[in-house]
From Swiss-Prot:
Keywords, in A-Z order: ATP-binding, GTP-binding, Nucleotide-binding
MF terms in GO: ATP binding; GTP binding
Organism: Thermotoga petrophila (strain ATCC BAA-488 / DSM 13995 / JCM 10881 / RKU-1)
Keyword ATP-binding: yes
Transmembrane helix found in the keyword field: no
Family to which the UniProt record says this protein belongs: Belongs to the RapZ-like family.
Function of the protein: Displays ATPase and GTPase activities.
UniProt-listed InterPro entries: P-loop_NTPase (IPR027417), RapZ-like (IPR005337), RapZ-like_N (IPR053930), RapZ_C (IPR053931)
Residues where ATP binds: 9-16
Pfam families: PapZ_C, RapZ-like_N
Binding-site residues, GTP: 58-61
Name of the protein described by the UniProt record: Nucleotide-binding protein Tpet_1006
């Protein structure tokens, strides 16, 4: 089965890294697809021996046609996976300061921060129709490639669920569709023999088994996610991201994330488990 991936997103958010990774995976990569040759390009790909093609579409494509309508047409005509990359304005400013590159919308006296905000506005609809939105604010190159690999593995299937534990003190994952707050639950951090362990350790699991409210909370989240996933499958959504947060992202959120993965997999769902802050202090 032929695969098509569309990569869009904010300048400086990692599109070059993403396209390089896709090329390493054997995708035929096309940068800034002109809208007026899209139909011909798709026909050539479908009739060729190529199995995988990736297309990058961003604000630089504006002089070659409307990037939004281009992405919409690709989604209408193919089973393409649309990936949108973003990062916080502060992080994009930092990255541009390091590279000293000029933002593609920085012209006619427009400052960098204003150019970033203008780009967010232009591409907002592509973000809305994307199958996957990845916030790269706290990601390095390796983590972005790893995240892309997870999504690409599941491209051919139905709706996949990405469950991420995190610590609120390290920031909420901006790409999460759902965020659940576990900070009200008993905290093993204050038990000396458990403080250095994580929610993946059997001793921490045994601790949580003493508190029925923990299992009740997990069951409630599970029921919500089941309803949401089934509805997303009906509407064709490929990926949903769920954030489970506690204070530091080491005990409560990790345990709940792992338990939910097991429960959802038993229901036949494809689940990606990630513990963002488990190694942080």
């Amino acid at each position: 089965m032929k695969r098509i991936v569309v990569v869009s997103g904010l300048s400086g958010a990692g599109k070059t890294t993403a396209m390089g990774f896709l090329e390493d995976l054997g995708y035929f990569c096309v940068d800034n697809v002109p809208g007026n040759i899209l139909e011909e390009l798709l026909k050539l790909f479908m009739s060729s021996d190529l199995e995988k093609m990736a297309m990058a579409i961003d604000v630089r494509s504006e002089h070659l046609g409307d990037p939004i309508s281009t992405v919409e047409r690709i989604k209408e005509k193919t089973n393409a996976l649309v990936i949108f990359l973003e990062a916080s304005t502060e992080e994009l400013l930092r990255r541009y300061a390091l590279t000293r590159r000029r933002h593609p919308l920085q012209k006619d006296g427009l400052g960098l921060e204003d150019a970033i905000e203008k780009e967010k506005e232009i591409l907002s609809h592509i973000k809305e129709i994307a199958d996957v939105v990845i916030d790269t604010t706290r990601m390095n190159t390796h983590q972005l490639r790893e995240t892309l690999a997870h999504f690409l593995v599941n491209q051919a299937g139905g709706t996949s669920v990405r469950i991420m534990s995190f610590g609120f003190k390290h920031g909420i994952p901006m790409d999460a569709d759902f965020v659940f707050d576990a900070r009200f639950l008993p905290n093993p951090h204050y038990v000396p023999e458990l403080s250095s362990k994580t929610g993946l350790d059997s001793e921490v699991e045994a601790y949580f088994k003493n508190y029925p409210v923990v299992e009740e909370f997990i069951e409630k989240i599970f029921e919500v996610l089941k309803v949401a996933i089934e509805e997303y499958q009906r509407t064709g959504r490929r990926i949903i991201t769920v954030g489970i947060g506690c204070t530091g992202g080491k005990h409560r959120s990790v345990y709940i994330t792992h338990r939910l993965k097991e429960m959802l997999e038993r229901e036949g769902f494809t689940v990606i488990e990630k513990h963002r802050d488990i190694e942080k202090v």
